[in-house]
Design a protein with these regions (language model features):
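Sec-dependent N-terminal signal peptides of Gram-positive bacterial secreted proteins and lipoproteins
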Residues: 5-27
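Low-complexity, acidic Ser/Thr/Pro-rich repeat tracts that form intrinsically disordered stalk/linker regions
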Residues: 24-49, 127, 138-139
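C-terminal edge beta-strand
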Residues: 113-128
Length: 185
């Protein structure tokens, strides 16, 4: 008898809690995610990694929507850097000596004006440990890859005086390629 009474009391308490929570959401406005319109583009989350002081060049990842033309908008700005949009491409530039994690969100809009749900670009900013800073990769899309090669000790380019030069537009010779392959083995 006592067990049955306890079960009924627990069920009654649960019903009261559920009723109050549903009514509170109705009265005070629950946090309901807005759904994109049917046929809206879909923006995908991205993860990027760069080094302190080195811009990262990439393309937004979005598909669908009306027509082929998508435009992109940054909805939430990053805190440790800046984002510049050029068509479907973007450049994230870390500010000053920033390191650590950062993020920003973007949306895609199709030619009919339908907007995607926001997607997050997660950014990791690392400090270069190799001591190599290239004098000729400031605006190059190869800057992060060049720094990756230096950090791994695979290729540091040419050193003239105190400056390192990656020479991103110069073709790699067979002997340089062979040396890089042997270094990774």
């Amino acid at each position: 008898m006592k067990t049955q009474l306890m079960k009924r009391a627990a069920a009654l308490c649960l019903a009261v809690v559920l009723t109050l929570s549903v009514n509170a959401a109705a009265l005070f406005g629950g946090k309901e995610k807005a759904q994109p319109a049917e046929g809206s583009p879909t923006a995908q989350a991205l993860e990027i990694r760069t080094y302190r002081g080195i811009p990262y060049h990439a393309q937004f990842l979005a598909a669908g929507g009306e027509g082929e033309d998508l435009t992109f908008t940054v909805e939430k700005e990053p805190k440790k850097g800046t984002v510049q949009i050029d068509g479907a491409s973007f450049t994230y530039t870390p500010e000053g000596d920033s390191t650590g994690s950062d993020s920003f969100t973007y949306t895609a809009t199709d030619s009919a004006g339908r907007v995607s749900q926001p997607a997050t670009v997660s950014v990791t900013i690392e400090k270069a440990k190799s001591g190599v800073t290239y004098a000729d990769t400031a605006d190059s899309t190869a800057a992060v890859a060049a720094q990756d090669l230096a950090e791994a000790g695979i290729f540091t380019g040419a050193k003239i005086g105190d400056q390192y030069y990656f020479e991103p537009d110069k073709p790699v010779s067979r002997s340089e390629f062979l040396a890089m392959v042997m270094e990774t083995a």
